[in-house]
Amino acid sequence: MKLDLKSNTRMLRERLKTEKNALLRKNISTVIRHIESEIANDVDMTMSTLVAEPSIRSYFSSLAGRYEPNQGSQVREHESYMSVDGAVAVRGMYDMVCEKKLVWSHFDVHNLVVDTHCIVQSGLFHVPTTGAALKELGRSVDDEAAYYLGIGNFVVMFPFDEKSGLLLREDIYVDPATYQGAEKRKIKQGDYSPNYEKIVELAVE
C-alpha cells in the first residue's frame, strides 16, 4: 500500500458521480471541499465549509499529544474526549494542524453513509506521526524528525445545518490503539504515492 492523500475523498467522489439527489450532491461536495481544503492547508476555505460557530469533537482523540486546547494541560496518549468550540478556537486548531500538516493522513474508507442531515465515513486510518510526537506520548524512537505510521479504525461524522447547508461540526471517533507499535513502523520515502504532496484537487461541483 502507498500512502495516498486522495484516499480521503475517493469514495465521496465516486458517490458524487452517481448521486442524483440535489441536496445529497451538495452535502457530498461540501464534505469533499472541507477535507481537501484541510489537506491543502487552506484554513480560510476550511472555515468556509462550517457554520459561524462550529465545533470539533474527538473521542479517543487522534490529536492527543499533538494539540491541546487547554494551555498547560498534561499530554495524555488516550485522551477520551476533546471538544474545540467556537470559530476562534476552531480556527486556532486548524492554524496549528495545517501548519504541521497533521491532517496529511491516508484513510481507507470502507463504509460511506450519505443522508440529508449527516455524512458518515468509517474505515482504517493511516496516520504519519513525527517521532517527536510519539516521544511526547512516552514512546522510544530513534529519530524525532522522522515520520512513523499509526494505524487504527476511524469513524468521522459530518452533521449539517439544514438552513445554511454548512457543517455544524466534525465528530471524530478514533481507535485508542492507533499509536500502539507506531515506533516500529518508520515511514520511508517509497511508502508515499508519487507526487504525494501535489495531488490535492479542490475543484468540486
What are these regions (language model features)?
Residues 107-112, 153-159:
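Hydrophobic/aromatic beta-strand elements that line small-molecule binding cavities or substrate pockets
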Residues 1-52, 200-205:
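Short, low-complexity N-terminal intrinsically disordered segments enriched in polar/charged residues
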Residues 115, 161-163:
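Structural motif
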